[in-house]
């Protein structure tokens, strides 16, 4: 089928384009914001992207034109498609038509946690050998993209959104998703541009859960009154879940230990019977609830507790969900999508648990349709009150909210100061960066909260602070090759392993250090640690190794190996590595190209569980 996507560079549309291409459709599209990384990803898949919207973009006579909910009926390509009698459809309707009718749709729905929970569900199923398909509104770190085409007619994990579908279909998107198993994380007032009350939101969710067939399964959060009300409309089996014993539920998780790197060990029971012990690197009680819902769903799909446990342990999270963008001068910069007061509160609570030693500085951009309106003005003051300092940007496109119903940043700052919290408003991103560069200290965590790019604040701040340890990108390849060549270190297929590499950039964005952390099952291999000769003796090697070990902990490694010819004392004294015989090294590490490529040196191991 020939398929044209209007707005193809959006996160959702771009993922749909990749899924359609993998399914052997002829896919093209248009957009006004054609820039990396999405433009690069589409190009690499052989998908043509037309820059700008114009009637002639449809000259190739597609069989169907996909319209996003940001398109109005007078959009130039919509008008052109109708004039040419081309079929118009929506993203959800096409997904239903081509992928969801004949398989088992696992739909993750709710006001909060959809992206993380659906990403975790997809990874647990994949790690358990079930070969799922998925389409998710974010980028799971373990997959590197928001879509996957798995076994035909198998399980399809999809993030179920209650937002409206298109200008010609005002029903919620998830009405199209043919649900068989549903996770319902929470139901609160959100999307206030289309829902005027909590009752209206609940009505949409109630209609959705009523679509689950009698032999389906609804897994619902027992601590969400709105979700429990909605569950009464289900005709299928309903199972509830909760963290802790305070609320009665079918599935219960109880934290039993905290480990290094913010990992949590927890036990799970189903109706009083022990199911298993699990370990996650996702921070916060709300993420334990997300894990528990996936355990319930995966169990319903036939996975064993051991299979589920392996997937949960190795899950690395989702981009823009408490994602560490880099560490510079001891300041950790975190990116988070939180823009609803509940999400803000839970994110700050989780970060306090993970980075409790220093200050938590929240930087907030009221950008979403919900956050730019005044309905949650008082709730934001309560939600942000647990941070040590709040920096507030102007409302993004304020004209999209009525003047009498518009969020007021100055009022929020005043309310927070009245609670004893440092709070300031800024008119420009560069002024926020300058303030943070002058005031943030080693040990502080800066969490940037926005549903958009926020003017590139993260990268600007890391660059301004200098000597930032960040994930490597395509623009670092030249500097990486030069650095590794100078250090006489070989790293084959460097461009294919960028996601395993961290780099340290100076204020001019030059690569002055690097390290790789390869993960093989429960074990990691620290390798390719190098710094520029001119910068040696400044502690850069320690910074890089510390960041790599932190990444290994967050991604579920139990132990990390390395081979060194000259630095065994350094790794023993600074991190606690111990010498080990090569015969005792994990088989997957022994078979890795990096380990096999080192013929001499001392082999060392660090136990991350101790």
Regions found by a protein language model. Give the residues of each.
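Conserved acetyl-CoA-binding loop-helix of GNAT-fold acetyltransferases
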Residues: 537-550, 554, 562
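Conserved active-site alpha-helix within GNAT-family acetyltransferase domains
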Residues: 554, 558, 565-594
């Amino acid at each position: 089928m020939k398929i044209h996507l209007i707005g193809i560079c959006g996160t959702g549309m771009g993922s749909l384009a990749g899924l359609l291409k993998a399914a052997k459709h002829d896919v093209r599209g248009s957009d006004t914001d054609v820039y990396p990384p999405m433009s690069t990803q589409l190009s690499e898949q052989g998908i043509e992207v037309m820059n700008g919207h114009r009637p002639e973009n449809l000259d190739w006579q597609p069989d169907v034109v996909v319209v996003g909910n940001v398109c109005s009926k007078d959009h130039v390509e919509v008008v052109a498609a109708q004039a040419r009698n081309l079929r118009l459809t929506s993203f959800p309707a096409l997904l239903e038509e081509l992928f969801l009718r004949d398989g088992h749709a696992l739909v993750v729905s709710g006001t909060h946690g959809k992206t993380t929970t659906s990403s975790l569900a997809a990874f647990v199923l994949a790690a358990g050998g079930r070969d799922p398909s998925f389409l998710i509104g974010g980028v799971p770190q373990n997959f590197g993209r928001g879509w996957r085409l798995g076994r035909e007619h198998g399980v399809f994990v999809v993030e179920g959104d209650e937002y409206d579908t298109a200008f010609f279909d005002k029903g919620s998107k998830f009405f199209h998703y043919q649900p068989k198993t549903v996770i319902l994380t929470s139901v609160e007032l959100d999307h206030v541009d289309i829902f005027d009350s909590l009752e209206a939101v609940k009505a949409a969710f109630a209609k959705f859960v009523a679509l689950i067939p009698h032999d389906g399964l609804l897994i619902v959060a027992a601590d969400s009154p709105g979700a429990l009300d909605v569950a009464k409309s289900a005709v299928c089996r309903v199972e509830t879940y909760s963290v802790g014993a305070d609320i009665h539920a079918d599935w219960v998780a109880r934290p039993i230990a905290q480990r290094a790197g913010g990992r949590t060990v927890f036990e799970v029971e189903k109706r009083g019977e022990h199911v298993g012990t699990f370990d996650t690197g996702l921070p916060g009680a709300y993420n334990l609830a997300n894990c528990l819902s996936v355990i319930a769903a995966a169990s319903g799909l036939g996975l064993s507790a051991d299979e589920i446990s392996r997937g949960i342990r190795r899950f690395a999270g989702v981009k823009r969900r408490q994602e560490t963008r880099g560490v510079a001068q001891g300041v950790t910069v975190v990116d988070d999508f939180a823009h609803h007061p509940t999400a803000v509160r839970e994110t700050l609570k989780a970060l306090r648990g993970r980075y409790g030693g220093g200050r938590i500085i929240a930087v907030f951009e009221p950008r979403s349709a919900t956050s730019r309106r005044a309905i949650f003005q008082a709730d934001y003051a309560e939600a942000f009150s647990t941070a040590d300092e709040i920096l507030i940007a102007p409302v993004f496109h304020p004209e999209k909210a009525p003047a009498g119903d518009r969020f007021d940043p100055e009022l929020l700052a005043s309310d927070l100061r009245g609670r004893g919290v440092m709070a300031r408003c800024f008119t420009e991103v560069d002024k926020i960066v300058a303030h943070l560069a002058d005031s943030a200290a080693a040990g502080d965590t800066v969490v940037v909260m926005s549903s958009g790019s926020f003017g590139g604040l993260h990268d600007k701040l890391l660059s301004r602070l200098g000597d930032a340890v960040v994930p490597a990108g395509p623009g670092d390849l030249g500097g990486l090759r030069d650095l590794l060549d100078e250090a006489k270190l070989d790293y084959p297929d460097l461009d294919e392993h960028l996601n395993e590499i961290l780099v340290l950039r100076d204020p001019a964005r030059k690569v002055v250090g690097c390290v790789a952390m390869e993960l093989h099952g429960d074990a990691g291999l620290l390798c390719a640690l190098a710094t520029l000769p001119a910068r040696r003796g400044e502690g850069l090697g320690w910074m890089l190794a510390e960041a790599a070990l932190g990444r290994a902990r967050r991604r579920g490694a139990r132990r990390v190996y390395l081979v060194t010819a000259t630095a065994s004392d350094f790794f023993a004294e600074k991190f606690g590595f111990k010498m080990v015989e090569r015969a005792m090294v994990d088989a997957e590490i022994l078979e890795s190209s990096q380990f096999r490529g080192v013929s001499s040196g001392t082999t060392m191991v660090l136990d991350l569980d101790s």
